[in-house]
Amino acid sequence: MKRSMYAGRVREEHIGTTITLKGWVSRRRDLGGLIFIDLRDREGVMQLVINPEEVSSDVMATAERLRSEYVIEVEGFVEARQQANDKLATGMVELKVSALTILNTAKTTPFEIKDDVEVSDDTRLRYRYLDLRRPEMLENFKLRAKVTHSIRNYLDDLEFIDVETPMLTKSTPEGARDYLVPSRVSQGHFYALPQSPQITKQLLMNAGFDRYYQIVKCFRDEDLRGDRQPEFTQVDLETSFLSEQEIQDIVEGMIAKVMKETKEIDVTLPFPRMSYDVAMNSYGSDKPDTRFEMLLQDLTVTVKGIDFKVFSEAPAVKAIVVKGNADRYSRKDIDKLTEFAKQFGAKGLAWVKVTDGQLAGPVAKFLTAIETELSSQLKLAENDLVLFVADTLEVANNTLGALRNRIAKDLDMIDQSQFNFLWVVDWPMFEWSEEEGRYMSAHHPFTLPTPESAHELEGDLAKVRAIAYDIVLNGYELGGGSLRINQKEMQERMFKALGFTADEANDQFGFLLEAMDYGFPPHGGLAIGLDRFVMLLAGKDNIREVIAFPKNNKASDPMTQAPSLVSENQLEELSLQIESHD
């Protein structure tokens, strides 16, 4: 029989009609000789009623065989329910079954197919096809589909061209580790799976495409966390002849459309702009969460003359004030915060509380001489807790920024209904890598430096600024972009600043440098992490919730057992040999 409609879409207007439904048995109940079935499909749940006095013995026998997750087909008459269930969209109606067929049986599932199920992440991933049956998960992917549909319509209307770029590309330095794919034809050579279509989309601008976009898979072999996966999807844009502001206007319009169509939220345009330096100094993060205050305060000058060398001789002393919550933090709680602070390079965490109008705590006695000034600067009040970090400016900012976010979550200070977008601009071009012992690109080596700082490419790299911009949402980096280098001389200077010899630059990026000999236009763009965006719209804290078949924290798939061993024949074809490092 042909399905008439989705079970979850049956409503009062269908009363009096005969329909056919197909789906899964969510629950079966026997009550007073009647059998009640909750039939589930992707649109919801519908109650079925099987009355032994109104159906054949075969139908009744089939109904008695039903168990959870059996796949069935039913035909019946839609009636009004005697007792409505306002928890269901179909709660005003039920289906009086006249015909029933079992399309497939099911073993007992390893966990219940319902929301808020308590089961380990690896079990969910091992049986992902069952996990995805849960209504909450289905809603996540309906939302994701709406987001991508909205984005495509918006960019199509602006005459962006959707172009697919290669999945098998060249491995290049800078950035995260590549996933490598050995070549059978060119033995000893390897492709790399793209970390982004960065260079190819720039070459499309050189080709005259003017406006490009792609919703594209990317791959990075990096340590995983809640908002990272080894393979992920980004909304990739590139444009020619547009300014930084014009690109940002396009992106803001796209996000506004998505928010309106998926969340019915009217976002305020333009988005606020914040310099990188302000973000780091006031929020302790280059992706600040602006839904709450608790800004970092610089006390370096204030404490300079006190008789406490930990403060007076430190390069920087900064603090955050936890307003009105000192009584929530015992010494044991603060010890836990101290251990947390050490993860970010801090040597420790100093603190005082405001108790009975006075500063109290381990370092209070050292602050007596500046107590009035300190109280005024920090706007202290009764029951405030002040946390200090004395260290380099970088360590103080990073530590207090992390503490700020942790404490806000612990104290439930964040309005989860808010969506605070902002641009972080005026970025440094380079960042120092302790691991590499050199400066590396803060974004990538194709970012255009500001005209005012470009001369420092041959001088102090710490002073070079980039025409780069990140878009931030609620403390997450949603995406990043920049204007790109389009002049060969400037690109060669950039490579040299990063430590490439001319031969190395030509070996790695010769095709790009050659392209710059052929009228490369001014261009720029941006990429937004689609998984992360949908995660935030769905109110989740892990992108696995919005990726159909994600990996676990070990970059493994418990369902398919990927990555897996391959046969000796396959390795031999590729001239590969596995060495043990035991």
Swiss-Prot record:
GO BP annotations, alphabetical order: aspartyl-tRNA aminoacylation
Catalytic activity: tRNA(Asp) + L-aspartate + ATP = L-aspartyl-tRNA(Asp) + AMP + diphosphate
Catalytic activity, EC: 6.1.1.12
Chain's role: Catalyzes the attachment of L-aspartate to tRNA(Asp) in a two-step reaction: L-aspartate is first activated by ATP to form Asp-AMP and then transferred to the acceptor end of tRNA(Asp).
The protein's assembly and partners: Homodimer.
NCBIfam families: aspS_bact, PRK00476.1
Record-given protein name: Aspartate--tRNA ligase
Taxon lineage: Bacteria, Bacillati, Bacillota, Bacilli, Lactobacillales
Gene name for this UniProt entry: aspS
